């Protein structure tokens, strides 16, 4: 298993980005070898790299994200009701995940659980409705992988109660634990 965690924005934000596949190949791997992708949340800068030209970049991967996250960002009704400035977030998530959903390669996470041996999903809602961290444990060591739990380290490490405009639930974002 070669799990990927953050597919990034792909080329959604311009042609100078989206070099993940090149970097995977430079490391001696192929995108087809990635079999697990763990999504912290579905903002375009975190899921845009899942697709290229509408096709799955990682065709053998199971993409996992929180049930609430998928239910919110992949909902046509929510897109239709979203303010104009938020529609791009919904459209980006839908375009990025649709090929995986259609292929049966999207799996929702509904609880804090071990997804594969040594990797556990942990709810850290606040930045988005279904934000999650992933805790990797092996040989007595622990690594916490997070998305946008922290935005400005110099400010938020000193005062974790500081949130940002993009946190959908400011109160929950203040108390989300890192692990």
Task: Provide a role label for each language-model segment.
Residues 1-14:
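Surface-exposed, interaction-prone regions with an acidic/low-complexity signature
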Residues 1-3, 48, 56, 96, ...:
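Catalytic core of the metallo-beta-lactamase
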Residues 2-3, 42-44, 69-72, 151:
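Solvent-exposed loop/turn segments at secondary-structure junctions
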Residues 7-8, 49-51, 75-76, 156:
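Short, solvent-exposed loop/turn and secondary-structure capping segments
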Residues 11-22, 129-179:
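Cap/insert and terminal regions of metallo-dependent hydrolase folds
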Residues 15-29, 33-45, 60-123, 172-179:
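Metallo-beta-lactamase
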Residues 52-60:
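Basic, amphipathic juxtamembrane/active-site segments
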């Amino acid at each position: 298993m070669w799990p990927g965690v953050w597919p990034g924005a792909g080329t959604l934000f311009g042609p100078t980005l989206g070099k993940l596949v090149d970097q995977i190949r430079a490391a001696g791997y192929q995108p087809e070898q990635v079999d697990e992708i763990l999504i912290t949340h579905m903002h375009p800068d975190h899921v845009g790299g899942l697709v290229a030209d509408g096709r799955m970049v990682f065709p053998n991967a199971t993409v996992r994200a929180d049930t609430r996250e998928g239910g919110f960002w992949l909902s046509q009704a929510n897109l239709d009701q979203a303010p104009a400035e938020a529609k791009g977030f919904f459209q980006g998530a839908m375009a990025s995940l649709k090929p995986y959903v259609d292929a049966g390669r999207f799996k929702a996470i509904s609880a804090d659980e071990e997804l594969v041996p040594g990797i556990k999903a942990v709810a850290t809602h606040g930045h988005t409705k279904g934000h999650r961290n992933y805790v990797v444990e092996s040989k007595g060591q622990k690594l916490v992988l997070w998305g946008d739990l922290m935005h400005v380290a110099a400010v938020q490490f000193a005062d974790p109660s500081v949130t940002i405009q993009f946190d959908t639930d400011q109160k929950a974002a203040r108390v989300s634990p890192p692990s």
